[in-house]
């Protein structure tokens, strides 16, 4: 997979806004969207923004990342991209997500779980940066990490920056279990050669596949 430029908050890592590490007992853990908001949305100001998200993309007060970015000063949110279940979570598991218009914002919604699962050049032509904000669960069969990988591929091909708004892995970072996918069995629920429980946040996972070039076509 062609490498992509992933914007950073920490100078030490190549991903945007991993959750803030709690330095003292009881310190609040902040999801990436809150870190971005505290920075004044600086890396998005003046850019045309696309957003891959679903109902799990919220702040600690359950405000949707869609609504936060849509109303953010200086940010021009121009398109939404719907993974499995859609951006508002109104499609059943495995159901086809269609291109539509978001009722709350009037923004176009491009389906990433219908006729195609990888954004087409046409879907990306009006954006300067792609933001990804979905809560991961830490297991390989979660289709959203496959969507993330395909979004990264498509954006790399078009020279579009990707911002991953990170969130904690609910299974933690110390538990890694399960076998790798065997050759011939890669699919949208097993797209990468990683253990079933892989012990990374979605931001760390994005960095990992970016640096390792892991896409299912290149794995032997």
Can you describe what each PLM-predicted range is?
Residues 28-75:
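N-terminal phosphate-binding or glycine-rich loops at protein starts, especially the Walker A/P-loop
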Residues 89-93, 163-186:
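Glycine-rich, charge-decorated loop segments at or immediately adjacent to ligand/cofactor-binding or catalytic sites
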Residues 97-127, 139:
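Glycine-rich oxoanion-binding loops at beta->alpha junctions
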Residues 136-148:
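Glycine/threonine-rich flexible loop motifs
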Residues 219-220:
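Conserved small/polar residues in nucleotide/adenosyl-binding loops
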């Amino acid at each position: 997979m062609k490498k992509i430029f992933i914007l950073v908050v920490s100078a030490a890592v190549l991903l945007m806004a991993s959750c803030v590490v709690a330095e003292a007992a009881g310190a609040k853990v902040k999801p990436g969207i809150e870190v971005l908001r505290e920075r004044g949305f600086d890396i998005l100001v003046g850019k045309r923004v696309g957003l891959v998200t679903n109902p799990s993309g919220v702040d600690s007060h359950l405000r949707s990342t869609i609504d936060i970015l849509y109303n953010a000063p200086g940010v021009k949110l121009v398109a939404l991209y719907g993974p499995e279940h859609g951006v508002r979570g109104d499609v059943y598991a495995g159901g086809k997500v269609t291109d539509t218009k978001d009722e709350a914002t009037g923004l176009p919604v491009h389906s990433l779980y219908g006729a195609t699962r990888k954004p087409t050049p046409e879907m990306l032509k009006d954006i300067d940066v792609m933001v990804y904000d979905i809560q991961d669960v830490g297991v390989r069969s979660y289709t959203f990490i496959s969507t993330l990988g395909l979004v990264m591929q498509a954006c790399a091909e078009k020279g579009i920056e990707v911002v991953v708004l990170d969130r904690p892995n609910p299974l933690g970072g110390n538990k890694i279990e399960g076998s790798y996918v065997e050759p011939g069995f890669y699919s949208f629920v097993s797209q990468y050669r990683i253990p079933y429980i892989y012990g990374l946040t979605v931001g760390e996972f994005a960095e990992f596949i970016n640096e390792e070039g892991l896409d299912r076509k290149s794995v032997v």
